[in-house]
Design a protein with these regions (language model features):
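Canonical Rossmann dinucleotide-binding motif of NAD(H)/NADP(H)-dependent dehydrogenases/reductases
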Residues: 2-36
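A glycine-rich helix->loop->beta "capping" turn
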Residues: 56-59, 79-92, 98
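The beta1-alpha1 cofactor-binding region of Rossmann-like NAD(H)/NADP(H)-dependent oxidoreductases
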Residues: 64-75, 107
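Substrate-binding pocket helix/loop in short-chain dehydrogenase/reductase
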Residues: 101-102, 109-111
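Active-site helix of classical SDR
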Residues: 125, 161
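Residue(s) in the substrate-gating loop at a strand-loop-helix junction
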Residues: 145
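C-terminal beta-strand-loop-alpha-helix "lid" module of Rossmann-like NAD(P)-dependent dehydrogenases
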Residues: 175, 179-225
């Protein structure tokens, strides 16, 4: 990879994605800031990003990309490659929170959540990997969450979407190890971003009402989380450090959080268990799994 990367980011209209875009571009990295409907629902956000890029001479290009639509993903990736000649880093950031007692979440709600939080990165990775394979280099960054390692009541479906993302991203890290392509998982704790201003809640009120006082659990969880929020720029700075880390030196997981949820301990144990499993399966050499590079901090 060259020192300045070409980076494609999903969900760039607000929140972490917007911060990642600004932080990376200000360090000279070319950023393709993607979002749904930049000429529609996100027209204001897209205009703000373009205006900022022009005002500060930042290498930012806004593209339309809906992670739930295969054709939309393919068009955006093709447009980025046509413009820049390559994609060095894909940051799978688009996602949302679904909160509520698990029984109150409908099947349709669960399907929509997984289509964005899990299948979205599946689509993006499938679109960028042929280009990265031709380059013999690339980084897939998956924005997971502490909720990808721990479970809170009323967050079961959101946790499930992030658990799925982590399993998929870790499998990719083994499978791509010999091709010069790295798969990285970033696990932010609780940070004050717009994602919690647009939380979707379980739609089946009749089911929720059968829980009596326990119906208040989702509100209690959100209150507890919001009382310990950190500065989201910490996560953007971590992303910058990961992007600028030399090839082959990145770790599989990075936990970035103002709270101690025990995620580092879970990751350390998982690292050892996974190393043992790969060794037992006779796959350690095939996957080039390095015990010392499974988890870390930035």
């Amino acid at each position: 990879m060259s020192s300045k990367q070409v980076v494609l980011i999903t969900g760039s209209s607000t929140g972490f994605g917007r911060l990642f875009t600004d932080t990376l571009a200000r360090k000279g990295h070319t950023v393709f800031a993607t979002m749904r409907e930049p000429a529609g629902r996100n027209a204001k956000n897209a205009s703000e990003i373009r205006t900022l890029a022009q005002k500060d001479s930042l290498p930012i290009h806004v593209l339309e990309l809906d992670v739930t639509d295969d054709a939309s993903v393919a068009r955006a990736v093709d447009a980025a490659v046509a413009k820049a000649g390559r994609i060095d880093v894909a940051i799978n950031n688009a996602g949302y929170v679904l909160s509520g007692l698990s029984e109150a979440v409908t099947t349709e709600q669960a399907q929509r959540l997984m289509d964005t939080n899990f299948l979205g990165p599946v689509r993006v990775n499938r679109a960028v990997l042929p280009h990265m394979r031709r380059q013999r280099s690339g980084v897939l960054i998956h924005i997971s969450s502490a909720a990808g390692r721990i479970i809170a009541p009323s967050m079961g479906f959101y946790c499930a979407s992030k658990f799925a993302l982590e399993a998929f991203a870790e499998a990719y890290s083994y499978e791509l190890a010999g091709q010069g392509i790295e798969s990285v998982i970033v696990e932010p704790g609780q940070y004050e971003t717009s994602i919690f201003g647009s939380v979707v809640t379980g739609a089946d009120e009749a089911r929720a009402n059968t829980y009596g006082a326990l119906k208040e659990i989702p509100a209690k969880v959100q209150t507890a989380l919001s009382s310990t929020s950190g500065n989201p720029q910490e996560v953007a700075d971590a992303i910058l450090r990961i992007v600028e880390t030399p090839a082959g030196e990145r770790q599989l997981r990075y936990f970035v959080s103002p709270q101690n949820f025990g995620v580092d301990e879970i990751n350390a144990l998982s690292k050892q268990v996974q190393a043992n499993i790969l060794e037992a399966f006779g796959l350690a050499a095939d996957t080039k799994f390095l015990k010392g590079k499974a988890v870390g901090s930035v």
